Amino acid sequence: MKAIISLLLISAMVFSMIEAVPLEEGLQLFEGERGCLPHNRFCNALSGPRCCSGLTCKELNIWASKCL
């Protein structure tokens, strides 16, 4: 019984630590992982003519100079 209670308490502590990271910070980390540059919303140079759209990089056509 003590083991179950201890496991529940540890699980609750781990969950509260995960939730402590602000959403914006988490999105910035995810944005960096996918190669987007946050100041101009373009992907890094190695990915070619692509820009950030939501959570992914998409092809940048000749008519678009910046991702919306």
Curated annotation (Swiss-Prot):
Function of the molecule: Insect active toxin causing rapid but reversible paralysis in crickets. No activity shown in mammals. Does not show effect on mammalian voltage-gated calcium channels.
Protein known as: U2-agatoxin-Ao1u
Free-text note on domains in this protein's UniProt record: The presence of a 'disulfide through disulfide knot' structurally defines this protein as a knottin.
Maturation propeptide residues: 21-34
Subcellular location(s) of the protein: Secreted
Secretion signal, residue range per the UniProt entry: 1-20
Disulfide bridge map: 36-52, 43-57, 51-67
Transmembrane segments: none
Annotated GO CC locations: extracellular region
Source species: Agelena orientalis (Funnel-web spider)
Tissue: Expressed by the venom gland.
Family: Belongs to the neurotoxin 01 (U2-agtx) family.
MF (Gene Ontology): toxin activity
Classification via Pfam families: Toxin_7 (PF05980)
Keyword list, A-Z: Disulfide bond, Knottin, Neurotoxin, Secreted, Signal, Toxin
Domain of life: Eukaryota
Zinc-finger as UniProt keyword: no
Alphabetical list of SUPFAM superfamilies matching this protein: omega toxin-like
